[in-house]
């Protein structure tokens, strides 16, 4: 993923702008409409941009027809246009008024012995899986499972009672009731 490489190299010290990106909703190779696939990819894209790339300042999409037959014109496909509009308006992180401020939300990638506050926090998952074929994610926090069924697979976890303790968080992603990915984290809860 080119964006991962650019972000990993510069994201911690430079603002990032993605220009000239887009999803053609017509496959030239197969000569078929792939609107449903593009709508899902667009939903994933706008859901995960502020989570995975919090220092990304702007993402600009193509809005034109390609001479090679690829279709990027948003206004010509109502489903893709609707997904685009929903993507940019559903998150408070995307602002339409430059003088307004997005909410103070911070995302951190979990790793073992990561420190979390003794408070209620939200956990979410970014699962790198071909075609993102995940039906649901189960988070088990100190033996108590909670399930989320849609991206970004968010659940609330209250660490208030675990101040000064180590908490075990097991995350399992499922497809057709079979585990496709899992990871366990040991987190330090602050006093």
Predicted regions and their residues:
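Substrate-binding surface in catalytic domains of secreted glycosidases
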Residues: 1-7
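Generic detector of leucine side chains in alpha-helical contexts
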Residues: 3, 49, 56-61, 73-74, ...
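Substrate-binding cleft of secreted/luminal carbohydrate-active enzymes
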Residues: 14-102
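Long, low-complexity serine/threonine/glycine- and acidic-rich segments characteristic of extracellular
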Residues: 102-191
